[in-house]
Structure formats: C-alpha cells, structure tokens
Amino acid sequence: MSSEPLFPFAHLMSNNVDKSAMFVDMDQSKAYADCRPSYTEELFKTIAEYCQETNPDLSLAVDVGCGPGMSTIGFAKYFKKIIGVDISKTQIACAPNNISNCEFRVGSADKLPFITSGTVDLFCSGQSFHWMPQNETFAEADRVLKPGGTIAIFGYDLPTADVPEVQSYLHEMWMKLIPFYPQCCVQALHSLRSEELPYPGQIRNDEITLSKRLTVQQFIDFMQSTWPIRAYKSENPEENILGDIANQLSEALKKSGSGSDFLVTWNIYILMAHKPML
C-alpha cells in the first residue's frame, strides 16, 4: 500500500488544524530526527546532477522545511554551502552543528530576507512542501534562484510492509488516522501528482525507494514522530493508541510466522524544474 488507496478518503481530513502548534514539542522533534527514514544517496545524486545540467558550479543550496536537517546534510557533499530553514525552533535545535558548510536558520519558506536575490543554485523541500503557502513559496524561490537554478520538491509515500498480515493492519491504522491529517496533506497523500512547479519542462522521478527492516518498537518510534498520532492522542487522551498499534503489529507478525521484524518500504518521488535562463 502506498498512499494511493487513501486518496479517495481525503475528504475525511481535518480543516481545523493549528499549524502553529506543529513540531513545537521537543520530544516530537527529537523523535523526528531519530526515527524518520534517511533519504538514499541516490536521491541527492539525482537532484545534484540535474542542477549541474544548467549550473555546473554548485555554490549554494537552500533546503526549506528542513526539519532537523535530514536532507540538508545529504546535499552538503555536493554544494559549497547549504542553508537549512525551518519554522520550528525545536526542529532546528535538533539539527547537527558540526558540518562546516551547513547552516541552519529558523524561518519561513516564503520569507528568506537573509538570502540575496539570484544567488541560489538549488531551492528544495523534502517531505514538507505541503505545509507551506505554495504560491508565496514559489515566488520566493524565483527571487533567490539564479537563472538556470533548480527547484526540487521531494518526499515519500506512506510506508508499506512486506508481510501481508502487517500490511493489512497498516491500512486499517491509516484509515483510523486519516481524519487527523490536515487538508493541506491531500496532495502529499497523492505523491504531489497534480503539483505543477512554476517553470516549464518539469520532470518527475518515481524510481527511488527506501527500505529498512524494523521491529515493532522501531515502527512505533517512527509513528511517534508523525502529526496524526499527536493529534489523535490530544483528542483521545484516554486511549493508548501507540500501545494498540504495537499489540496489533505483534499479533500480525505472530500470525504470519515471519519473525520479530518486517521490511518497510517508502516510495520516493521527486519533482524538478529549471528556472529559465535569461
């Protein structure tokens, strides 16, 4: 199951989510930094090579909605400097501070006054673009990008499991949680398939996957980092939803006879386009 089977139920998603309350809790930001999947080297290489088609000298990248810097640090080997920007102070506090060409700032994707116009080779957003004011973010990207600069939006689908019994339960779990997703996540559930970047010649890459074997506890740790779990717990404080998920996963694994862990796969998508040359 990718996110696709849930897309028809997007109308169940919430219209009453206070985005300002998201990722302000240090425990959740630490869980995000520790338990979210790390992007593969193939993703960073794919985007960097696309950038070099029009700007071979990769001087500056900006990673907006960077969270604790999981994608920012992946681009560091390709660019002379990269700046990670996130609106959450706790996410930025969890970013690494020992990479010489990485800088992290608290800020909004649509307001980057500390970046000079026409100086950026790559403006990117990983697993966060759906949270942003899109038209304003595109306008700010256009301001800071060099002619020929690249805009890249990427992310991953909901995880799938290789054990049928586990996969069946995961679908039930996501259906239970979908009312706790904000409406701005609708396109993310559809892998941004209808998203149009502001430049001509947009390309899409759906060929990269990320797989990792997880125990039940490791999967629970991943779920702890997600917003729907936080929202569900806030509205249903009497329930132990993570404990329930753990019990159901353990039972599914026991029923399958497949051992104590399972293979989890995230399908990655990338959208890229070049700003036209002058």
Language model: regions and residue ranges:
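A short beta-strand submotif of the Rossmann-like class I SAM-dependent methyltransferase core
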Residues: 125-126, 134
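Conserved Class I S-adenosyl-L-methionine
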Residues: 191-278
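Nucleotide donor/acceptor-binding cores
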Residues: 58-60, 118
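Conserved catalytic/acceptor-binding region of the Class I
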Residues: 142, 146-214
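A short acidic, Gly/Pro-enriched loop at the edge of an enzyme's catalytic core
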Residues: 113-122
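Class I SAM-dependent methyltransferase SAM/SAH-binding core
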Residues: 60-62, 67-112
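A short, conserved alpha-helix within the catalytic core of class I
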Residues: 132-140
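Conserved class I S-adenosyl-L-methionine
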Residues: 2-56
